[in-house]
Structure formats: structure tokens, C-alpha cells
Amino acid sequence: MAETSLVNYFLDSNTWLYAFIESQDQMKSDRAKRLIHDNVFIISAQVINEVCINLIRKAHFDEVGIQQLIVSFYLEHYVVDITREVLLRASEIRSRYRFSFWDSIIVSSALNANAAILYSEDMGDGLVVDGRLTIRNPFGPSA
């Protein structure tokens, strides 16, 4: 696992899914694969859960494949647990920024791990949260 002080990027589940599931949007799939290949990321237990359930449902991953993926996430990336602190901060973020319940936990997890950039396709490209976390669409023109 990477040292958290050396990792500045948090990657939301949608980008992982473009990389793992062959999509009709080849540009997004290629960009996601390149981004993942070139970086170590901060992710959360929630991201792992979302990726796994979608791979089971959409790509028919079996349990061996899911177990291998979980192990690789923990070996190759910094994984943030969902703690009471993360959940309480998520509530504050929901109130202030009007994110969904799940998105606020992602944002809170990224802030908790001191990420500078949160890559997410669906959370407002360019938005700066708490003056220190910038949301970037990995498929947008600025990516």
C-alpha cells in the first residue's frame, strides 16, 4: 500500500467501472485504464463495495475474481475506512454542498485522507470543497 502522504488523488467508483467493464464509450474506457495504470489512488471501502457489486451484476465476476480485486485494491492503493468521523463530516458536507448521501461520504473520505483531487464523473467538475479538495471529471476537457 502506498504512503498516504505521497498520494494526492482519490478515485470514485465510476472511473474504476469504465476501466473494468467494456463500455460502448471506448474513449472513457481507454482514459480510465490509462489513469489507473499511471497512478496510485486513495479509495474508500465504499468505492470498493460499489465497484464489486457492479462487477458482479454487470460483468458477472465470480467470487474468486472479486476476492482478487479486493486484495489488489488494498495492496496497490490507500484505502480509507468509513469511520464515525467520516460519516459526521459527510453530514456537514451534505448540508453545505447538497451532495447525495453516498457522494458526501466519498467527498468526506477524500478530505479525511488529505486528497487534493477527487476524480469523479458526476460531482461537479472544478468544484473546490473546503478550500482544498478539487473535483475533476476524468473524462472532461480539463482531464
Question: Which ranges hold each PLM region?
Answer:
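Short, well-structured N-terminal submotif of metal-dependent ribonuclease cores
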Residues: 1-43, 58-68, 142
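Acidic catalytic patch
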Residues: 46, 71-95
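Beta-rich strand-turn-strand
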Residues: 98-99
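Acidic, PIN/NYN-like endoribonuclease modules and their adjacent C-terminal/linker elements
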Residues: 1-4, 108-143
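Conserved glycosyltransferase catalytic-site signature
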Residues: 13, 103-104
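Active-site-proximal, substrate-binding regions of enzyme catalytic domains
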Residues: 50-78
